[in-house]
């Protein structure tokens, strides 16, 4: 899980999800998981 100020989809399978006001990226590739913080 990468914590970044700006989260961007890395590949075509990355999806942007908002949970409780936190922007997350979920993907099949675990390296692409991101969280805004």
Swiss-Prot record:
Q: Which GO terms describe its biological process?
A: translation
What PROSITE patterns would the database entry show? Answer: RIBOSOMAL_L36 (PS00828)
Pfam families linked to this entry: Ribosomal_L36 (PF00444)
A Gene Ontology MF term for this entry? structural constituent of ribosome
Entry keywords, A to Z: Ribonucleoprotein, Ribosomal protein
Per the record, its GO cellular-component terms are: cytoplasm; ribonucleoprotein complex; ribosome
Q: Report the sequence similarity comment from the record.
A: Belongs to the bacterial ribosomal protein bL36 family.
Q: What is this protein called?
A: Large ribosomal subunit protein bL36
* Gene that this sequence comes from: rpmJ
């Amino acid at each position: 899980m990468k914590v970044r100020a700006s989260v961007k989809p890395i590949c075509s399978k990355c999806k942007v999800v908002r949970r409780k006001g936190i922007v997350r990226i979920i993907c099949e590739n675990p390296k692409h998981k991101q969280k805004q913080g």
